[in-house]
């Protein structure tokens, strides 16, 4: 008996853009495991699987201040453009910076004047008549460069990046860190270095590369080289230090940072509506 429902099939279809029968078969083959089903659909070549599977349904904004980055969600972009909503986000990110909250629960308990962040969100939600949600927060203690990107001039920032870095204290350090923040915002790096990629992710990408190559009819003896080439392509896309720089495509981000004498220690990227 299948351990998934019609609703599960619908959800997988919405996440991946694959056909209904393909989604049903993928869930059956994976015994109802969504991650395995997504992997199976990627092997079969479903369009936009990797990108659409990360998408969440939300509007809202991101805000940054003093080493803190938050995402505050609303149900509609109409509310996201609301001045009171944006003012609340500014208060919340200020509370995140001062309290150094490590997670959403800690930030909800932080104070905004005489009330808590959680209470302030609930009060504005009741006033506006729309569900509001503090989705996530990040805080870095070191030297930080922040970048916020708007999708349109009339909308609040929807993409936020924090880059923690070390340098020699020159003005050029900040310029290099800012360039990296722009890079992360645009090319959506997921990991800092190759060593930061989880082993299960590497294993999954290797399986996908191998099965896809087999499905394409590639010679058996050529598979190892093809798989390694495609895996290196994955690293080049997902790993910040291995990406070609947007400012000089002939050099990697690592090469430009080395030239600037700057070391990125960690980063985070929030995008409204993305996992």
UniProtKB/Swiss-Prot annotation:
Disulfide bonds: none annotated. Keywords: Cytoplasm, Elongation factor, Protein biosynthesis. It comes from the Bacteria. It is found in: Cytoplasm. One of its GO terms (cellular component) is cytoplasm. Residues 76-79 are annotated as: Involved in Mg(2+) ion dislocation from EF-Tu. Pfam families: EF_TS. InterPro entries: EF-Ts_dimer_sf, Transl_elong_EFTs/EF1B, Transl_elong_EFTs/EF1B_dimer, Transl_elong_Ts_CS, UBA-like_sf. One of its GO terms (molecular function) is translation elongation factor activity. Associates with the EF-Tu.GDP complex and induces the exchange of GDP to GTP. It remains bound to the aminoacyl-tRNA.EF-Tu.GTP complex up to the GTP hydrolysis stage on the ribosome. Belongs to the EF-Ts family. HAMAP family: EF_Ts (MF_00050). PANTHER family: ELONGATION FACTOR TS, ELONGATION FACTOR TS, MITOCHONDRIAL. This is Elongation factor Ts. It comes from Mycolicibacterium paratuberculosis (strain ATCC BAA-968 / K-10).
């Amino acid at each position: 008996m299948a351990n998934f429902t019609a609703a599960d099939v619908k959800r997988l279809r919405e996440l991946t853009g694959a056909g209904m029968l393909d989604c049903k078969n993928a869930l059956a083959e994976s015994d109802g495991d969504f991650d395995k089903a997504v992997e199976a659909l990627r092997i079969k070549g479903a369009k936009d699987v990797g990108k659409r599977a990360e998408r969440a349904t939300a509007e809202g904004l991101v805000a940054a201040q003093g080493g803190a980055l938050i995402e505050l969600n609303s149900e509609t972009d109409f509310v996201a453009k609301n001045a009171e909503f944006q003012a609340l986000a500014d208060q919340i990110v200020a509370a995140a910076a001062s309290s150094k909250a490590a997670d959403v629960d800690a930030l909800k308990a932080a104070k905004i004047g005489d009330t808590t962040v959680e209470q302030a969100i609930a009060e504005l939600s009741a006033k506006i008549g729309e569900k509001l949600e503090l989705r996530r927060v990040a805080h870095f203690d070191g030297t930080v460069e922040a970048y916020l990107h708007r999708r349109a001039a009339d909308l609040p920032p929807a993409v936020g990046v924090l880059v923690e870095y070390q340098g020699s204290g020159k003005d050029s350090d900040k310029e290099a860190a800012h360039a990296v923040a722009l890079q992360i915002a645009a090319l959506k790096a997921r990991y800092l270095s190759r060593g930061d990629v989880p082993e299960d992710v590497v294993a999954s990408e290797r399986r996908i590369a191998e099965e896809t190559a087999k499905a394409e009819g590639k010679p058996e003896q050529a598979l190892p080289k093809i798989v390694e080439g495609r895996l290196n392509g994955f690293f080049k896309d997902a790993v910040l230090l291995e990406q070609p720089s947007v400012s000089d495509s002939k050099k990697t981000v690592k090469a430009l940072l080395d030239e600037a004498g700057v070391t990125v220690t960690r980063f985070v990227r929030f995008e409204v509506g993305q996992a």
